[in-house]
Amino acid sequence: MRLVFAGSTSTQALTITVDDAVTAAQGKTIAAATSVGTVDFTAGGVSDTFANLTTTTAVSTNMQAIDAKDANVNIVVSDAPLASMSANNVTALNALMGATTGTVTATINGNGAELDGLQATGTSSTQALTITVNDAMSGSSGVTSLNAI
């Protein structure tokens, strides 16, 4: 994908509606192509790998640029599944889910001790998470951890 404007290298005041899913890098390029405050990514949203959507514990700069133009963007984490989630991965996923009021879709797995750090449903985004807990959890502490997930 490339945006070209004959005879001009400056940012234009364009109203942009994106019809297909874009990667984080493509979305940033589209967002940067206009000086208008919003870009509508609603039709296709963003679909990319976890590494391209986040940093170690935060949202990537590409995703931040998209979110700045469309705070309700839907996001699909294309890695299936995000295996053996670490505490940092959970923090980054929470940041991604907190960056949009749209739907975040991901398939994840990991140990209960890390996964219980996932933000609860009812925060700013709708979360469509498929979660697999890899370790055995038992007793009241296991029930508490599973309820947190």
Q: Which residues does each PLM region occupy?
A:
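Solvent-exposed, low-complexity segments and loops of surface/extracellular structural proteins
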Residues: 1-149
